[in-house]
Amino acid sequence: MRLITHNMLSCNIKGVTSGFPLRIEAGNVIEKEVDFNPDFIRHMFAKIEWKALVEGARSMGYAELPEESPDAAVLKSDEPFLKKLHHALLELHLEEGALVCPETGRKFPVNKGIPNMLLHEDEV
């Protein structure tokens, strides 16, 4: 599971009001090379919840992103930053581990890179 995917997931258990961001418990993280596309990264930047991305990247062992979200000027001119963002969003893969609901503590397993977000009957 890539961090770009993680950034779009939330806990949908009935009654949960703050199910985002899911905390990552990383078991096995791998890197898979992906072609760099700066236009795609710039486009996706507006859709990303920055704090959740930074926390997710750090929990997967990647600490190259700044705490504060960069401004638009950085996105236009700073290619090294775009490459770091590209690496975090698209090249880091959580192969084994869990996603944890911040409100309930419910763990959703991640196996072979696929998060299992299915709910039990009593959670719907």
Swiss-Prot record:
- UniProt domain TRM112: residue ranges: 2-120
Inactivation phenotype: Semi-dwarf phenotype. Reduced organ growth due to inhibition of cell proliferation.
What sections of the protein cross the membrane? none
The GO biological-process annotations, alphabetized, read as: organ growth; regulation of cell cycle; regulation of cell population proliferation
Q: This protein's superkingdom?
A: Eukaryota
What the protein does?
Answer: Acts as an activator of both rRNA/tRNA and protein methyltransferases. Required for TRM9 tRNA methyltransferase activity. Involved in the regulation of cell division progression during organ growth. Required for the expression of cell cycle-related genes, and the G2-M phase progression during organogenesis.
Q: How does it assemble?
A: Interacts with TRM9.
Q: What is this protein called?
A: Multifunctional methyltransferase subunit TRM112 homolog A
- Protein source organism: Arabidopsis thaliana (Mouse-ear cress)
